[in-house]
Amino acid sequence: MNKQYSYPLDLSWSTEELASVLSFFNDVEAAYEGKVEAKKLLDSYKGFKAVVPSKSEEKRLGREFETVSGYSLYRAVQAAKEKGEGKISLGK
């Protein structure tokens, strides 16, 4: 996958909000490119949802992120919820 892509971000977000969203995107990338603790991904998802509470906005950002990265926010969160504890890996 192309490592040179831009994250779908809203420039009206505060620095803290940007950090929360980027942390979640980074954890999703880690799940696809290696392994990440399920709890860590779910915790960063909670931070993401504090910034993006709207389901439609979450879906829009998820589509944009998947288009540029090939990584699904939805699949990563579902895998983390199913696993509960331990590490998840969605890579090949």
UniProtKB/Swiss-Prot annotation:
Gene3D superfamilies: BH2638-like. This is UPF0223 protein SP_1404. InterPro entries: BH2638-like_sf, UPF0223. Coiled coil: none annotated. Belongs to the UPF0223 family. It comes from Streptococcus pneumoniae serotype 4 (strain ATCC BAA-334 / TIGR4). Pfam families: UPF0223 (PF05256).
